[in-house]
């Protein structure tokens, strides 16, 4: 079995590495020599190698799991040194679609393998043998595709994927991932929950009860949705919840809401969002958002309840 060299040791890379190690799949971690994560990787029982060393380029398959915005610099520094036929896996299609690495580095096979999970959850679900999905694209792979797909099947199983992996395109994965983050996962869900919490407490509802209703139950509801599917979920809920769901659907999901969703997707497709990312001060935005949530009544209630119930 060909070894995988994982470049980086953030949340996603750490989960990949530990899952593969626990599955006895050959893997090692590649880091800069002075990277503080070097010791963390080795103390986790993973082999570590210095990026750019002669040993580093020995393997045939790599996973580039450093942040997307660092991919260009990494390949500019090291891309030409990879042997012809080397394969690099990407956990998200964004940098591939934006920078067209297949044209800049045609001697490398650029392959998408995208687990549909954040790194911490990838590790957690692996340990409890939960459901983990992934998609992949080999549209820029030019070697022995049958041999590689057999390797990827074994790799996918070893990392914990048991839903798929399903074939897609780099373009589709990138656009769907960005759209789901903007329209649902990282915006609608947390911000709607926060507004609901604020609305309940403003009307005299105890913060602890509001927390249960608007935040804690999210996980329980989503678990049920994933376990039984959309139809099964609406078969499952109580009559009050069923009638209330229809009322909320009619009042909240207006044509204006749909137009806003369409606008988000259009700005992903036409490149406007790419430009926003290029021009953004990520740290300034992150600090602003973190400070907003840090002072929110929902966060303060979460911290209070966690302290009371360690």
Model-derived features with residue positions:
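NAD(P)+-binding Rossmann beta1-loop-alpha1 motif at the extreme N-terminus of oxidoreductases
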Residues: 1-49
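Short, acidic/turn-prone active-site loops that include or flank metal/cofactor-
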Residues: 32-34, 52-55, 92-94, 115-118, ...
